[in-house]
Amino acid sequence: MASQSDLMELDMAMEPDRKAAVSHWQQQSYLDSGIHSGATTTAPSLSGKGNPEEEDVDNQVLYEWEQGFSQSFTQDQVSDIDGQYAMTRAQRVRAMLKHAVVNLINYQDDAELATRAIPELTKLLNDEDQVVVNKAAVMVHQLSKKEASRHAIMRSPQMVSAIVRTMQNTNDVETARCTAGTLHNLSHHREGLLAIFKSGGIPALVKMLGSPVDSVLFYAITTLHNLLLHQEGAKMAVRLAGGLQKMVALLNKTNVKFLAITTDCLQILAYGNQESKLIILASGGPQALVNIMRTYTYEKLLWTTSRVLKVLSVCSSNKPAIVEAGGMQALGLHLTDPSQRLVQNCLWTLRNLSDAATKQEGMEGLLGTLVQLLGSDDINVVTCAAGILSNLTCNNYKNKMMVCQVGGIEALVRTVLRAGDREDITEPAICALRHLTSRHQDAEMAQNAVRLHYGLPVVVKLLHPPSHWPLIKATVGLIRNLALCPANHAPLREQGAIPRLVQLLVRAHQDTQRRTSMGGTQQQFVEGVRMEEIVEGCTGALHILARDVHNRIVIRGLNTIPLFVQLLYSPIENIQRVAAGVLCELAQDKEAAEAIEAEGATAPLTELLHSRNEGVATYAAAVLFRMSEDKPQDYKKRLSVELTSSLFRTEPMTWNETGDLGLDIGAQGDALGYRQEDPSYRSFHSGGYGQDSMGMDSMMDHDMGAHHPGPEYPVDGLPDLGHAQDLIDGLPPGDSNQLAWFDTDL
């Protein structure tokens, strides 16, 4: 039974001038909400320390209260209490508070007592007197810390609605803090989450995100976090209430634990929702998130922030914004962090961003770290590192140079050797090697380095089963580049590269012919690769290999000339060009020139003299002249007239300028963009690492802007066309720099 001293203690706790008596449970510390401890928010508690107050202080306060009310109060005793405070309205209010508190403290499983206490507290929260409302809010907050009374509160929709309404409408800081704290305590339970949701608590909590009081902010964000994690419909409600904009605005705060919860809320809201990603972008989210990655060292914050960036990195609108904000460099700072989950998230995000970062400056540190990560024992790390390197070396002269200088060739070759038949690793690694072996100052060194580090056997092996078409396509392009180095001609031949290239060419050509005969008009995709691309790539690789006399003998011995002549009739200009190019090389040998003529090549070659692509026309002219070596002078003269009228049909002086011969194939290739939100690496079955949507032109790694032949393309003035050898001398030497397949992210 309660004594007079017990009642005095309760009365003192509620006096306005005695607020200090409960200040020890008003600490403004930060909330865990499951982020910092790793705990979930399932009932009965989200974490080991779910309240902002210290547990020992809580226990002390509740202990003191329980000491005073350890026995149940009878109705007579409650009536005595009422009698003592019946003189004024304020005294009656205090009496009502005591009555409600007594009932709630005694509440265990007695639904009748709860039913009697809750309406009284609810009425007080709705009182017009703000002093009364404040006292009620303080009391409800204190009671919400005790499990029994907390359940009584959450099971009353009227009470929860009153708490939400009071929090939203009050101008009193203490009232706002207590009501927000009460909702936070309720959010530890699924029943409480549902009650908050049904009472319209989410718009009210979003409104509180604009509070200037830190403790209110902490309660609001952690309660919203619990709702987002466990309450169905909460995500949409937060979006509709403008929560995304409010949360992005809070990213300029400096408390790392608060930021960790806020960024996790953003990740939950943005995942799988394009509209949310665009709202984050419009609110300045990318820059703020990158700033966090650049500024802080708290692992949990870096991890949650990297998760948001990972989700945003698959959005085509957010991707360039993150890159421009310095996202690549900021993420690269954490690739050597001891936290593997942070490293993996940064790598996934970098991989997603890398196709939009091919022109970024200041990537030296990142590239060096990525080359080191190729030696990791973690397959996911190696896979991502290879993919990022492939994209960053596409169309970027400086990045190619840097990767070569830090041992990238050796590291990539070793990666391919270690990967075996794991195409999610070998394909991006081969793509990166293809980029590094062409169109930069150290390209020849790179071509040699692949051989010196024992890479040729494994590269040729990848042309064979079980390799799938995306990997084969990348490998063919690499072999073409390796053939630019004369020292690789014999080793490639000895490894059996030529017969396999011919086999692939024949198979791909047959597939295209079969489709055409069946009335198909669109190009055929097999595992995300067009068979026309394989035809073009294999023919182009054979073209470069045919510079070697011994390779020409092997190529001719495989009965390829009829097929090359047939390819001259292809409706695809790129294929016409590589077919004319390989015939041009083969025609250096008299026997081959005769075989080419015997296959009826004169007619299609003569037709190609009128091609709008000057590269095609030039190769066709060269083949015709080589075929005419043993023809009568009269025939040569007529051919010279035909060539003159064809090749000089427009502006003859352009042949004396270092202009575009038309040997370029068109649009530049794009680096591969990752669009899946699943962090797992894209498999070749869904389109392959090398899938793109740019057509055959995208197989090249052109420089941005207008193309110019460059030092590998001396374009001399076309001499007297009556002399065959002079025409040959006027050709670009082997078309070494402008063939498709040699440098792109496939």
Regions found by a protein language model. Give the residues of each.
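Extended, compositionally biased low-complexity polar/Lys-Gly-rich tracts
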Residues: 5-7, 50, 529-552, 558
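Alpha-helical scaffold repeats of the Armadillo/HEAT/TPR superfamily
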Residues: 116-117, 154-163, 197-204, 239-246, ...
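Hydrophobic alpha-helix feature that most strongly marks membrane-spanning transmembrane helices
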Residues: 569-572, 588-591, 610-613, 632
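Alpha-helical solenoid repeat architecture
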Residues: 44, 93-105, 120-124, 135-149, ...
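Alpha-solenoid helical repeat architecture
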Residues: 125-128, 167-171, 209-212, 227, ...
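Intrinsically disordered, low-complexity regulatory regions
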Residues: 1-123, 128, 137, 510-530, ...
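Short, hydrophobic/charged alpha-helical patches characteristic of ARM/HEAT alpha-solenoid repeats
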Residues: 105-116, 120, 131-132, 149-157, ...
